């Protein structure tokens, strides 16, 4: 029986649930010798909405600035959001804490995945998932997938080259796209990739000294090359097909990605 079923059967009040949660966090902190911070975004919102924004950075800053600890375990649950906000949050927590682990039991998609890849460790339950990396951009009054936007423009360009025309609706839409806007979308995607390529070697790979198979020393260039391969794989929309696709532990540990994940369900103290 799961904990939630147990709590329902016990008819726990909101206050009792809060006390139970604080007790579990305290127990977790002792087991891991860490400070657990819980961040949960608006999973119920559609992906195009941006629940992870600069407002979240200011909240995280206010809640963690006075914490006196070397280790931070950051529980994250979000469908995605702003890459710039992720950069600010990571810059702050990396400057404040010596060791950071990210804990994923629900969804940490898109920008949430980028943040998770800045950790020294990644802890996941079987129910947890990351997602394809795809920056979100604001076009007019809507926030949409940068990749989908670029693919749509590419599709319309190819259609125009092949047939010599576009239907009136598409022609009107394309006419409103400026070169600067299109360039900005390309830069947004590259920005997301750059963060992953910078953070993986610096943090997740910092103790990767010897290769597992050939047992040869790992150079900084090898770390950067591997980080770029992982970023490219997570941005490979031909493989994942959907922005909201769940990337599970088995996917992350597969040969094509090859990340080491700490499996919470295999740890009798944590599960």
Predicted region positions:
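Terminal-region recognition feature
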Residues: 1-107, 113-114, 118-271
């Amino acid at each position: 029986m799961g904990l939630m079923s147990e709590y329902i059967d016990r008819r726990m009040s909101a206050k009792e649930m809060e006390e139970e949660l604080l007790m579990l966090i305290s127990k977790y902190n002792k087991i891991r010798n860490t400070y657990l911070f819980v961040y949960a975004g608006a999973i119920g919102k559609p992906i195009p909405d941006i629940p992870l924004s600069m407002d979240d950075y200011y909240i995280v800053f206010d809640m963690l600035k006075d914490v006196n600890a070397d280790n931070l375990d950051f529980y994250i649950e979000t469908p995605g959001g702003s890459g710039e906000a992720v950069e600010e949050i990571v810059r702050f927590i990396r400057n404040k804490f010596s060791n950071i682990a990210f804990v994923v039991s629900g969804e940490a998609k898109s920008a949430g995945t980028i943040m998770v890849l800045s950790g020294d460790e990644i802890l996941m339950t079987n129910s947890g998932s990351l997602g394809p990396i795809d920056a979100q951009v604001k076009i007019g009054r809507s926030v949409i997938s940068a990749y989908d936007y670029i693919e749509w423009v590419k599709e319309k360009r190819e259609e125009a080259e092949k047939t010599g025309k576009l239907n009136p609706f598409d022609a009107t839409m394309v006419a409103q796209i400026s070169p600067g806007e299109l360039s900005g979308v390309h830069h947004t995607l590259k920005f997301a990739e750059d963060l992953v390529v910078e953070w993986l070697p610096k943090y997740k790979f910092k103790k990767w000294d010897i290769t597992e198979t050939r047992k040869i020393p790992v150079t900084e260039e090898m770390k950067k090359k591997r980080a770029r391969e992982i970023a490219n794989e997570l941005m490979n929309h031909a493989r994942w097909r959907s922005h909201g696709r769940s990337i599970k532990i088995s996917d992350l540990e597969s040969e094509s990605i090859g990340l080491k994940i700490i499996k919470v369900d295999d740890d009798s103290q944590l599960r």
